[in-house]
Amino acid sequence: MGKCQVISHPLIQHKLSILRRQTTSTKDFRELVNEIAMLMGYEVSRDLPLEDVDIQTPVSKTVQKQLAGKKLAIVPILRAGIGMVDGLLSLVPAAKVGHIGMYRNEETLEPVEYLVKLPEDINQRQIFLVDPMLATGGSAILAVDSLKKRGAANIKFVCLVAAPEGVKKLQEAHPDIDIFTAALDDHLNDHGYIVPGLGDAGDRLFGPK
């Protein structure tokens, strides 16, 4: 069974508290999502493979380390996942970026996929699948399904806030997937929103649809 790791760094928790506030502006919300994603990236990328590389410093030749093989692929679930991409790219600028577009049917609460654009070599890359929220788990499960259909095997799901119901569903559907979150909240309400959560992340990042 994949792990669910809550990254409880003090800076992340402080910024997440500001992010949750109803009065936080769109500008500040966007910046905070970017900053939290970057801070989480250090932990999420902890097991990236390294290889030796010969370099010349101003003083001497030396053998040092660099990321090995194919670099990351960062795949946001549209639209809210876009807000996390730049923070992760600031750590690994060579990463490729794909997109999986989904929206939620507000009556059934089920996700509907409308776009899949991925790097051609997605099956050779470690993937950070990103979405600020893991609520019902439906979008995450469908996105992982899409990635696996295209040969992807090394996938981590990265979110800012998760509900226990969504974590359980994702782990049951894809027990090989590790989940990284800045907070594991209490529950989902009758409308499928995380409580206490932070509202509709897409609307708070980009404005109402």
UniProtKB/Swiss-Prot annotation:
- Molecular function terms in GO for this entry? GTP binding; magnesium ion binding; uracil phosphoribosyltransferase activity
Quote the record's binding site residues for 5-phospho-alpha-D-ribose 1-diphosphate. 79, 104, 131-139, 200
**Summary of activators and inhibitors of this protein:** Allosterically activated by GTP.
The UniProt entry, under Pfam families, shows: UPRTase
Signal peptide stretch = none
**Disulfide bonding pattern of the chain:** none
Which coenzyme or cofactor does it need?
Mg(2+)
Pathway assignment reads: Pyrimidine metabolism; UMP biosynthesis via salvage pathway; UMP from uracil: step 1/1
How cofactor binds (record note)? Binds 1 Mg(2+) ion per subunit. The magnesium is bound as Mg-PRPP.
Catalysed reactions, as listed in the record: UMP + diphosphate = 5-phospho-alpha-D-ribose 1-diphosphate + uracil
Which spans of this chain does the record mark as coiled coil? none
Task: Give binding positions for uracil.
Answer: 194, 199-201
Which Enzyme Commission numbers does its entry carry? 2.4.2.9
By its UniProt entry, which InterPro entries does this protein fall under?
Answer: PRibTrfase_dom, PRTase-like, Upp_B, UPRTase/APRTase, Ura_phspho_trans
Q: Name one GO biological process term.
A: uracil salvage
The UniProt record lists the keyword Transferase: yes
Q: Which UniProt keywords apply?
A: Allosteric enzyme, Glycosyltransferase, GTP-binding, Magnesium, Nucleotide-binding, Transferase
- Protein task: Catalyzes the conversion of uracil and 5-phospho-alpha-D-ribose 1-diphosphate (PRPP) to UMP and diphosphate.
Q: Which family does it belong to?
A: Belongs to the UPRTase family.
Query: Could you tell me what this protein is called?
Result: Uracil phosphoribosyltransferase
The taxonomy runs:
Bacteria, Bacillati, Bacillota, Bacilli, Lactobacillales
Recorded name of the encoding gene: upp
